[in-house]
Amino acid sequence: MNTADEPIFLPDGQNTIHDGIEHEPTGGKGLIDTTDTLMLLLDHQSGLFQNVKDISVAELRANATALAKLAALLQIPVITTASVPDGPNGPLMPEIHEAAPHAVYVPRKGEVSAWDNALFVKTVRETGKKTLIIAGVWTSVCVMFPALTAKAEGYKVYAVIDASGDPSEMASRTTIARFIQAGVVPISANAVICEFHRTWNRPDAAQLADLYCMVSPNYRALMESFQRAEEVAKKTMTKAQTARA
C-alpha cells in the first residue's frame, strides 16, 4: 500500500486523463484549474517598458513570451490588448503573437483598464473560462484594475508578477499587498508553467523544459550540462561496444 510519503511511479508510456498523473492529487485542488483557464496578456508595450524599474525589461519580456509559448503548446486561450498603441505607450511587443498565433487581440478606445472596455469583457466571457491568468505593464494599473474587477465578478484570478512590471519596487509591493487583500493570487511565470506541467511523464516534456530555460537561465545551464553528459556517455558506450566487437 502506498503511503503519503512514498512516491508513485507510473509505467513507461502510461497515459491518463491527467497527462501521466494517475489520479487527481489532493494538492491539485489548490492549484490552477488547467481545464478552465484563460490567459490575459495586457499592455506589454514598448513605451511602457521604458518606465519599468522593478524588474529588468529583458526578464519581463522573456517571461511574458514563455507564457505565450505555454499557451500555444497547451492550447490555452489568450486575449491581448494595448493601451493607446499609436501614442507614447507604444506598440505591443511582437513576441507574444509570434509565440501564440492563436491569441485574440482586442483593441480599446482609450480605457485605462481593459475591463472597462465592453468588447474586451465580452470576449473574455465568450470563452466560458472562469480562471484568469493575468500579466501586463504596469502591474499597479493595467494588471491590478482588471484583476480586482474580475475577482469581484466571481473569477478566480492569478497575477503573474514577473511577467509584469511597475515604475518602482514600492508600486509593485503595494500592488501585491492589495492583490492579497482582494483574493487575487500573486504567482510567478515559473510557477504557472509548473502548475500546467504537473508531470514529466508526458510527450511534450522536452518542450516544457525549454520554457523553464526561458524563465531561468540557470536551468538552461543545467540542461546543457546534462545533455553534454548524455552525449559523452553515449560516445563512451559506443567505443566500448566497438572495442568488444
Annotated model-derived regions:
Residues 131-189:
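A contiguous pocket-lining binding segment that forms or flanks enzyme active sites
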Residues 124-130:
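Glycine-rich phosphate-binding loop signature in dinucleotide/nucleotide-binding domains
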Residues 2-110, 126, 156, 173-177, ...:
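Active-site acidic carboxylates
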Residues 109-122:
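Short phosphate-binding loop-to-helix
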Residues 83-84, 111, 162-165, 191-192:
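Short, ordered loop/turn segments at secondary-structure junctions
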Residues 112-114, 126, 150:
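Long, charged low-complexity segments
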Residues 89-96, 120-121, 146-148:
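Distinct, well-ordered alpha-helical segments
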Residues 84-87, 111-114, 139-143, 168:
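Acidic, metal-coordinating catalytic cores used for nucleic-acid/nucleotide bond scission
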